[in-house]
A protein has these predicted regions:
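RNA pseudouridine synthases
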Residues: 1-323
């Protein structure tokens, strides 16, 4: 029979490898009503269910096996490598850079990383490669910070397992509108997938569809109505930081979806002030090929968000001096 992961790739278009494996983890790919795994072999008569965004499927009537029309050529940005070994690299993603390619053809981190490896002679984009280097943890387009990239299939598989079993912890810096309390906050999260928007609630719903979220907040500095905060994710869900802080009445500065529109306009901030600054690996099992990362901490030394906060503080002080 055909390997399930290969079948899914054959009927989708522009579906990133990292999202493919995330879909397996999140039970969005099923065989005969049960959770599928990439290694499953499927045969005639099997019922395959794919709960995947429509954008990754060819238009009705098109042949999925055919390649899509070429995208506009795009020079990829130079990759900033924070850490690298033979299996993975930890990259810095600036604000506005996509993680994966989309139909706009805009520059993206995956293609930039692939180009970087090709220039080093570690990857042949024109060869008969079954595996294309991919990223393991996605950041929203407007979020900057650390992203883990896999150079080979085993690294991608095992890093996804590390993430799935919560053996990797991430910390963020953010600037909030309003000064939050420091502490651990718990709430209930619900995702409207159609509109890609999250709502946060104090209690579980009757149908128990909501999922619990836990967010750690540590206020590092304040400047008037703004706070520079360190955020720790005990759980990691879509838009968790942005939506949870908005629910607490202290939204992320520059957040168009959940934020304070007036303050965004007043400060001229057009994207969310959020940066993934630190990745910590816990005790990884010996059978995992990335076991050697156990206990390793990777940090972003000079996050742009700190300079952004310094600018807000300076502007506030100048306004006080003038008055």
């Amino acid at each position: 029979g055909v390997r399930l992961s290969r079948f899914v790739q054959s009927v989708t278009r522009d579906f990133p490898t990292s999202l493919l494996y995330k879909s397996f983890r999140n039970k969005r790919i099923k065989v005969n009503g049960k959770k599928g795994v990439p290694e499953d072999r499927i045969k005639a008569g099997d019922l395959i269910e794919l709960y995947i965004n429509d954008e990754f499927f060819p238009p009705e009537g098109a042949k999925p096996a055919h390649k899509p029309a070429p995208k506009k050529q795009q020079n990829q940005p130079k990759v900033t490598v924070i850490y690298e070994d033979e299996n993975i690299a930890v990259l810095y993603k600036p604000t506005h850079l996509l993680c994966h390619s989309d139909r706009t053809g805009d520059a993206n981190l995956v293609d930039a990383f692939t180009q970087y490896l090709a220039q080093k002679g570690e990857y042949d984009p024109h060869g008969e490669n079954r595996f294309k280097p991919g990223i393991c943890n996605r950041l929203d387009r407007g979020t900057e910070g650390l992203v883990i990239a896999a150079k080979n299939y085993a690294a991608l598989r095992d890093m996804n397992e590390i993430i799935r079993t919560d053996l990797l912890k991430k910390e963020y810096y953010t600037i909030t509108v309003g000064i939050p309390q420091s502490g651990r906050f718990t709430a209930w999260w619900e995702h409207d997938e159609k509109n890609n928007k999250v709502s946060i609630h104090a209690h579980q719903s009757q149908d128990e569809r909501r999922k619990q979220i836990i967010t750690d907040v540590d206020v590092l500095r304040t400047a008037g109505p703004f706070a520079l905060c360190k955020i720790g994710l005990v759980t990691g869900r879509t838009h968790q930081i942005r939506a949870h802080l908005a629910y607490l009445g202290r939204p992320v500065l520059g957040d168009i979806k959940y934020g304070n529109r007036k303050m965004n306009e007043r400060t001229g901030t057009k994207t969310q002030a959020l940066c993934a600054v630190r990745i910590s690996f816990l005790d990884i099992p010996e059978e995992n090929t990335l076991h050697y990362l156990s206990g390793k901490v990777i940090k972003l030394k000079e996050p742009q968000i700190v300079k952004q906060f310094d600018g807000l503080d300076k502007s506030r002080q100048e306004a006080v001096d003038v008055s």
